[in-house]
Amino acid sequence: MSGRGKQGGKARAKAKSRSSRAGLQFPVGRVHRLLRKGNYAERVGAGAPVYLAAVLEYLTAEILELAGNAARDNKKTRIIPRHLQLAVRNDEELNKLLGGVTIAQGGVLPNIQAVLLPKKTESHKPGKNK
């Protein structure tokens, strides 16, 4: 009989996601699928979704860290859109990157023009004018 013999072959290894292989939290498989379905190019390389997922994860972590700092400065434990707005607009590089982006319920940065501020008057001290 030509059988397979004993099933002493190697057991199949546990499946490991591409995200965990790359050490990422963002889904590499989903990014790959979106790149393929988005008609950006005829073919998509294996490294492209890993790189893009890593960039997206880094930018998200950067914004969330700054927004968390803004929330802590306002003595809040929950990040709201206002904190995201303050985080992005107070950071020079993120503000340039997201210059054309409107954050809903974000408000505006507090800013008063210098000409509108009250003028500081010189106080007359005795003994100075002679």
Curated annotation (Swiss-Prot):
The modification N6-(2-hydroxyisobutyryl)lysine is found at K6, K10, K37, K75, K76, K96, K119. Residues 7-19 have a biased composition (Basic residues). The modification N-acetylserine is found at S2. The modification N6-crotonyllysine is found at K37, K119, K120. The modification Phosphoserine is found at S2. One of its GO terms (biological process) is heterochromatin formation. There is a cross-link at K14, K16, K120 (Glycyl lysine isopeptide (Lys-Gly) (interchain with G-Cter in ubiquitin)). The modification Phosphothreonine is found at T121. Residues 1-22 are annotated as: Disordered. GO terms for cellular component: extracellular exosome; nucleosome; nucleus. One of its GO terms (molecular function) is protein heterodimerization activity. Pfam families: Histone (PF00125), Histone_H2A_C (PF16211). InterPro entries: Histone-fold (IPR009072), Histone_H2A (IPR002119), Histone_H2A/H2B/H3 (IPR007125), Histone_H2A_C (IPR032454), Histone_H2A_CS (IPR032458). The modification N6-lactoyllysine is found at K10. The modification Symmetric dimethylarginine is found at R4. It is found in: Nucleus; Chromosome. Its main location: nucleus. Keywords: Acetylation, Chromosome, Citrullination, DNA-binding, Hydroxylation, Isopeptide bond, Methylation, Nucleosome core, Nucleus, Phosphoprotein, Ubl conjugation. Gene3D superfamilies: Histone, subunit A. Core component of nucleosome. Nucleosomes wrap and compact DNA into chromatin, limiting DNA accessibility to the cellular machineries which require DNA as a template. Histones thereby play a central role in transcription regulation, DNA repair, DNA replication and chromosomal stability. DNA accessibility is regulated via a complex set of post-translational modifications of histones, also called histone code, and nucleosome remodeling. The nucleosome is a histone octamer containing two molecules each of H2A, H2B, H3 and H4 assembled in one H3-H4 heterotetramer and two H2A-H2B heterodimers. The octamer wraps approximately 147 bp of DNA. Belongs to the histone H2A family. This is Histone H2A type 2-B. It comes from Homo sapiens (Human).
